[in-house]
Curated annotation (Swiss-Prot):
It comes from the Bacteria. GO terms for molecular function: electron transfer activity; protein-disulfide reductase [NAD(P)H] activity. Required to facilitate the formation of correct disulfide bonds in some periplasmic proteins and for the assembly of the periplasmic c-type cytochromes. Acts by transferring electrons from cytoplasmic thioredoxin to the periplasm. This transfer involves a cascade of disulfide bond formation and reduction steps. CDD domains: DsbDgamma. It comes from Yersinia pseudotuberculosis serotype I (strain IP32953). The chain crosses the membrane at residues 197-217, 233-253, 270-290, 311-331, 332-352, 353-373, 384-404, 411-431, 435-455. This is Thiol:disulfide interchange protein DsbD. PROSITE patterns: THIOREDOXIN_1, THIOREDOXIN_2. Its EC number is 1.8.1.8. The lineage of its organism: Bacteria, Pseudomonadati, Pseudomonadota, Gammaproteobacteria, Enterobacterales. It is found in: Cell inner membrane. NCBIfam families: PRK00293.1. Residues 166-186 are annotated as: Disordered. Residues 452-592 form the Thioredoxin domain.
Amino acid sequence: MAQRFITLILLLCSVLLAPHSAQSSLFGENTSFGAKNSQSRFIPVDQAFAFDFHQQGDQLNLSWQIHPGYYLYRQQIKIVPQQAALGAFTLPEGITHHDEFYGEVEIFKQQLTLKIPITQAAEQASVSVTYQGCAEAGFCYPPETRVIPLDVVVAASTASGTAAVNSSATVNPPATTQPEGDATPVPSTLPFSPLWALLIGIGIAFTPCVLPMYPLISAVILGREKPHSQRRILILAVVYVQGMALTYTLLGLVVAAAGLQFQAALQHPYVLIGLSVLFVLLALSMFGLYSLQLPSSLQTRLTQWSNSQRGGSLAGVFAMGALAGLICSPCTTAPLSAILLYIAQSGNMLAGGGTLYLYALGMGIPLVVVTLFGNKLIPRSGPWMQYVKEAFGFVILALPVFLLERVLGDVWGLRLWSLLAVAFFGWAFVLSLKAHAGWVRVCQLLLLAALLIVARPLQDWAFNGNTQQNAVKHINFQPVANLPQLQAVLAQAQGKPVMLDLYADWCVACKEFEKYTFSDDKVQRQLANTLLLQADVTANNAEHATLLNKFNVLGLPTILFFDSQGNEITAARVTGFMDAAQFLQHLQNTPAVTK
């Protein structure tokens, strides 16, 4: 018994002493261990975002269990039905996350659950669910698309008017993964608060096409026999404004609903650029370059119809207000068109209807005041009304800057904001020169100070741009589009080691690599004798999926190294972000990469 016990102790000691040498013999010469270790920090997408779904009659339930240290982008979640119609649903509010390259975005952590009503589903109906997320450690997964088969759902007679909703969300059955080409975030809310529409409406009321008409409109509202009760006058004025607000609200809902059906397409760079051009043209009409309004024949017909209503009655006044919303003057057409275009681009029905309602309410507040108190509180007409109109031209010009910022990035976005601010303060300063009051001199000094402050980004661009460009020299990569092209380049590498950078616009850490790591002088010198390739897999199409699957790439950033014979040096693979010092150390520890 004692002998067996001693033998057991000796065996245990041998096991405890063995691991170091055993590990050396097992993995010391195995190059694939390095690649496996480089990816061990990150888990497969199915584990990072564990997805489950089930259908209960006319309801589809989607849920995600998000691994600690990982997150999903709210704006990247999309749901598209095929041969089915979905009822209205909304994504829950996410956690605000600041991104250096994309600004403020919303993300989901830990868990996400969606309940989506199904109004109709034919045989072989399905729902495509797309999502995309990242690891907090600096690693992003390509957009994932899953196809969920649906059971048949017969449309109810009461739901015949329900429209299909193409929205956004997530799924993960591994057998039906499909690459998704469009991964552009779709904003679900307006960057402008709808309350701004109230202020814009009040401001539009003081333009030369609107303010002089208010005394006439108030007389029409009250009718031939002016009511003696102030309460009655207030009710009539408010009813008129509500009629006008109804028209604008319906316009907002219709335009937002139309935009919702094409929400993803409206985020395409070409569409954003086209909308920006339209906004600029609308702004030019506010500066007096041309007049924009409804055809005169249509305006005349609407005016006659409005005049046929009986003033002084609630129904007649409400109808006049509703028709007045359709009669756009040159001062109101451009702002209204700009708001409608922007609402269509956002696709948010609640914000769309609310924004137009507040806009009409803002225009109606001065009218209510005029109707109650007469012309006493109306400012005297003059050139200042034209200046108000021109000021709203600058407000409209802010919209294309918002849209172009998504296409051009933060750097050029800041320059566009600076250019717009310089134009506005310069215009205000020139106007102030026409006044001679003493307090205007103080305003002029403030305007000049503001002009210098807002011009700073343009100054940096003009005077420091060349210096910064010379100081920060980015690596010039040779692009490769697919696996056959990569194999051809490797075959013609002429004995040089090769580095392949897998890049995508939706990969935040890829942009960090470009900005902080590849721009480093020491890193560039270390890679001087290396053939540098880059594959842009932003579109995530079939060719890109083939390339990523060939090298078992989980996500980005991933950097592959190949020796002079075109074989991957798996131990040198980089997965996840490395700063310049870490990447340089990695290169120096792998002599075969940069020999």
